[in-house]
Amino acid sequence: MRSSPLAAHVYLSVARRFDGGLARLGGLSLVAGIAACEALRGLGFGDVGLKWPNDLVVADGDGLRKLGGLLVEGGGEAAGAARAVIGLGINVRMPAEAAGGIDQPWIDLAAMSPQPVSRNAVVAMLLSRLLPALQQFDAEGLAPFLPRYAALDALAGRALRVHEGDGAWPASALGIAADGALRVRDGEGRERQVHAGDVSVRA
């Protein structure tokens, strides 16, 4: 099992109660991704974008390099409050010995900055954007975040392959729906929606 390198990256977990119940948690990973991306842009990393549903990426020609990712775990009662833990990881300084074990294109903040990157500064900015975003999301849902996502969408207009079960089909990305699903146009020109739980999307 490959372990994460010591003192090289940012790993952050935030636990929060959501009064809207379990239904409110739909779209939470998108909101956390928006906040994280906006935080990094606020630190001068203007090329960071979002790859649906939960990756922080940087465009590299026709492809994308992964900078970080998010994971959300939640639970609670359908009619009561819910709790969720948001986990976030960002590559800051990838050690050479760790880089050899990565099987996908990646990038770290050190490669994007001429100056040393402070992990403390990254965490402080992340929390300054994430905590207010979670409060707004609990009160208002996903709707006010949709335009912010569109401004950060790294898949917009890209040709994709949607992998579903044992098969895959070509599509082009159209943005996200009101519930956070990925909107795509398939090879026959039909608009379809892809939900995070049953497919993966590869640009």
Model-derived segments and spans:
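Catalytic beta-strand/loop module used to bind and position nucleotide/cofactor moieties
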Residues: 2-9, 13-203
